[in-house]
Amino acid sequence: MRLHDGIDRNLLHHERKGDGTMFNFFKKKEKAYYDVIAAPLKGETVPSSEVNDPTFAEEMLGKGLAIKPVEGKVYAPFDGEVAMVFDTKHAISLVSAKGTEVIIHVGLDTVMLKGEHYTAHVESGATVKKGDLMLEFDMEAIKEAGYEVITPVIVCNSDDYKDVIRTTGVQVEPGDTVIELDK
């Protein structure tokens, strides 16, 4: 897995485990980030700039990334609260236990589907734990209706953070870290 600066995260993780010698205290310690956002879907992460919608590509709503899903399920990316499930069920906004505001927007212009092909498993105000199933969608039906299923994952209050580190260009499973935030 590659970080934003091209460093192989798996290599770093392996090196940080230590080699059992007494010199482990010289090794760089893993950074503790203020908040972490896990992948809410299974698929490939891509930079926001690759999203075919200027609202997301130009990060008008905040910094983030997008996921090209391979499965029609959306999971909670952290412990927190569902701020809103859009009436059309194509998007969910959440607030983490640490105050990070995230919107997960399934597909582009999918508001036009008026909720068709989406099933919400949570309601506004619900408390969620990382990994809870929040939403299901019929990827093939959405594509057949003429819509892209690429899913932006946006930190709406990204200006509150000094660093927003995104992991793109990799295949992810729900629960894999994709965004790290530092104050």
Predicted regions: what they are:
Residues 3, 18-183:
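Contiguous, well-folded functional domains in the mature portion of proteins
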Residues 8-13:
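Intrinsic-disorder-associated, low-complexity terminal segments enriched in Asp/Asn/His/Tyr and depleted
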